[in-house]
């Protein structure tokens, strides 16, 4: 707790994430960076990466937080005991976790992600998260997001803008168009 007052950036390692093989095992909720709060940093990132980069990062963080809250309610009340929106929120946070936060250090491509690729992938993930979807059951919701996670993970393992990457991108676009 005292670290939070002094440190501008803090990575909270999580045994739970490590046990679940979610690497790097940095807890996205307990970790923080105060640098995004500095106007000069926000201006720099918004100028160099995307005019709304900081806003998008904060939006992704919010999806993660709301997903954790939904997950806790699902665990307490059961799959059928919560509204479908809770499942949707949870799976959106899982999408961000698997595609943006997790990394395969043993994969030559996924171990290091250039900023232009990070920008593209965050935009695609937020595009999926922001798209209106309607599910009949929590199984349909789960299957929908698992399919998208699988496709986007393959994108993470493919050279950026390569033929394989474009093939997976087209699959993603087909799935998201079909489901909307």
Q: What is each PLM-predicted segment?
A:
Residues 171-180:
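C-terminal accessory/interaction regions of large nucleic acid-associated machines
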Residues 1-153, 157, 161, 165, ...:
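P-loop NTPase catalytic core
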């Amino acid at each position: 707790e005292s670290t939070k007052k002094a440190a501008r950036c803090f990575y909270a390692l999580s045994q739970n994430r490590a046990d679940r093989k979610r690497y790097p095992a940095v807890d996205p909720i307990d970790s923080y960076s105060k640098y995004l709060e500095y106007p000069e940093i926000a201006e720099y990132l918004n100028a160099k990466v995307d005019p709304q980069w900081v806003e998008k990062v904060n939006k992704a963080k919010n999806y993660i937080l709301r997903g954790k809250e939904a997950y806790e309610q699902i665990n307490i009340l059961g799959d059928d005991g919560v509204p479908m929106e809770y499942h949707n929120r949870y799976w959106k946070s899982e999408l961000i976790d698997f595609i943006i936060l997790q990394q395969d250090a043993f994969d030559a491509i996924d171990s290091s992600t250039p900023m232009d690729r990070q920008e593209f992938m965050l935009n695609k993930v937020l595009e999926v998260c922001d798209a209106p979807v309607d599910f009949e059951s929590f199984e349909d919701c789960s299957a929908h997001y698992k399919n998208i996670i699988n496709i986007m993970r393959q994108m993470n393992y493919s050279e950026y803008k390569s033929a394989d990457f474009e093939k997976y991108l087209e699959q993603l676009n087909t799935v998201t168009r079909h489901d909307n």
